[in-house]
A protein has these predicted regions:
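Contiguous beta-strand segments within globular domains
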Residues: 25-47, 52
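C-terminal motif of bacterial Sec signal peptides marking the signal peptidase cleavage site
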Residues: 9-12
């Protein structure tokens, strides 16, 4: 009986916290773009409440290669229904390993309105991508470093520690 009462109180606290939320996580994935030989994190948030005019969303993505987190910042506008956050290119993503993402929604004064923490795990290793882009430029010209004049190809993956 005491356990049931504790669970009800805990559930009530969770609803209260959610009532103040400005946005919720609606999607997260690694994007592997073979054409440009890049991988990025892609996170989407769905707006729950009006966004603060002049506010900012800041996301920090764990660097799969190690080192400090990769951070992006984006202005918020009241008309936004969803917020899309994409990391700078990342390297050495490993299949099944959860990588951390921390998101902060800030009001115009820089005060934190909400934080969201999550992880993203890829279902493939980054070695599915070649180390060099397959095409160059807006016309998708073949990259001569990959498609050589002698007819051979170079699809080797990027060198990453194991």
């Amino acid at each position: 009986m005491l356990m049931m009462l504790s669970l009800l109180c805990l559930a009530g606290c969770q609803r209260e916290a959610a009532d103040d939320d400005v946005a919720e996580l609606s999607g997260k994935i690694f994007v592997f773009n073979y054409r440009v030989a890049q991988a990025t994190y892609l996170v989407t948030l769905r707006r729950l409440r009006p966004l603060p005019e002049g506010g900012v969303v800041e996301a920090s993505f764990e660097d799969p290669r190690g080192g400090p987190p990769l951070t992006v910042q984006q202005r918020l506008f009241p008309v936004m229904e969803k917020i899309v956050l994409e990391s700078p290119p990342v390297h050495c993503v490993k299949k099944g390993k959860p990588y951390g993402v921390a998101i902060r929604l800030l009001d115009p004064q820089g005060d934190e309105r909400q934080t969201i923490e999550t992880t993203i795990a890829s279902n493939v290793d980054q070695d599915v991508l070649p180390a060099k882009p397959l095409s160059l430029g807006p016309a998708y010209d073949r990259n001569p470093e990959v498609f050589r004049l002698d007819g051979s190809t170079e699809f080797s993956p990027e060198n990453c520690p194991t």
